Amino acid sequence: MNAESGSAVEVFRTVSVPLTQARAFALFTTRMTEFWLKEHSIGASELAEVVVEPRNGGRWFERGVDGKECQWGRVAAWDPPRKVLLLWQIGVDWQFDPEFETEVEVTFSEDGLDRTRVDLRHRNLQRYGDKTDQMRAIFDDPAGWTGTLAGFVDLADAQATSLH
């Protein structure tokens, strides 16, 4: 699929973590700094913190070690413990663009006793126009959403171990 086809383009990943749905949601949304790949930063200084403001319309941004904030997007839907829908407003130049958005939907569903399935769908990548295939390849790369979710799984595993 390419941008010219007009079809929706997305990247989809799923993982299962040894936490309840509520704990998995809270861990993902409140401790993103701990699993976000540090090299995935758009700020001038080193990444210090990733913040998801816990409400519809909240900001999604990074704070650098210099204290400066760089907005990534906003929270379009806040539905704990089931779903968070984040608007990714970073263009092909890796800068925040308030006029541009793709969607990162993360859902949390029970997956057995004290386990949660986490589905991440980064959709509407066709909005990158003639750079759609390039951007999809970046998000689809092992260093993209796969790496981010691997960090989340590691954090969830450590959290589950500390609970027992």
Segments predicted by a language model, with ranges:
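Hydrophobic ligand-binding cavity/cleft-lining segments
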Residues: 1-47
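A short, structured loop/turn motif at beta-sheet edges
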Residues: 18-22, 76-83, 107-117
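Short, highly charged C-terminal tails/helix-capping segments
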Residues: 44, 49, 153-164
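Hydrophobic/aromatic beta-strand elements that line small-molecule binding cavities or substrate pockets
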Residues: 13-15, 50, 72-77, 101-110
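Hydrophobic pocket/interface hotspot
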Residues: 24-28, 60, 75, 86, ...
